[in-house]
């Protein structure tokens, strides 16, 4: 990054640790180590990691026009479907004074998530099935924000069950259309999902194409 580049801070997001420079998104980090081969750069004497939109859906949503990113620096975040830690590492960056609980059911990606947590003191991995929030609720004091990225047919019900258990104020849901039903029209599946989520205060629905086909990122207040 040249010294002449001036970062354009994303519009009125609550969290100032996210910046966008032209078609790239970055998170300010206290842990300047690559997690998945991303670029690390210095801007105004601060260290940033590039947030790859082809590897992480919130970055894709930002580039596709997401206006509100409701995660604050001291929030407690419950992340369902944490996988190997690509996206949750950026959530860890933007919540340096917060706590991030990452739930992952598969052992192989969980082992990588566990390695990541050894380098980040605000990240707590949980090896459990998000279908059963009662199995890990004892570990979690409170939740401000819930983020879900799970490829299961009942992904909406998983989201609602965890909202009922943890009562977060705000939520992100990655809707994976083809995981719900592979043969039905995408618009029909999206409309059904919107009906199921109408009990919440829906804020934004962002199509993630071309970064992810038949994927949407939905933000809401509960």
Swiss-Prot record:
Record GO terms (molecular function): histone H2AQ104 methyltransferase activity; RNA binding; rRNA methyltransferase activity
Family matches, as SMART domains: Fibrillarin
GO biological process, one term: box C/D sno(s)RNA 3'-end processing
Chain residues that bind S-adenosyl-L-methionine: 86-87, 104-105, 129-130, 149-152
Signal peptide positions on this chain: none
InterPro entries attached to this UniProt entry: Fibrillarin, SAM-dependent_MTases_sf
Keywords assigned by UniProt, alphabetized: Methyltransferase, RNA-binding, rRNA processing, Transferase, tRNA processing
Record keyword Methyltransferase present: yes
RNA-binding recorded as keyword: yes
Enzyme Commission code: 2.1.1.-
Assembly information from the UniProt record: Interacts with nop5. Component of box C/D small ribonucleoprotein (sRNP) particles that contain rpl7ae, FlpA and nop5, plus a guide RNA.
NCBIfam families: PRK04266.1-2
Family recorded in the similarity comment: Belongs to the methyltransferase superfamily. Fibrillarin family.
The protein's role, per its UniProt record: Involved in pre-rRNA and tRNA processing. Utilizes the methyl donor S-adenosyl-L-methionine to catalyze the site-specific 2'-hydroxyl methylation of ribose moieties in rRNA and tRNA. Site specificity is provided by a guide RNA that base pairs with the substrate. Methylation occurs at a characteristic distance from the sequence involved in base pairing with the guide RNA.
Protein name: Fibrillarin-like rRNA/tRNA 2'-O-methyltransferase
Organism the protein comes from: Thermoplasma volcanium (strain ATCC 51530 / DSM 4299 / JCM 9571 / NBRC 15438 / GSS1)
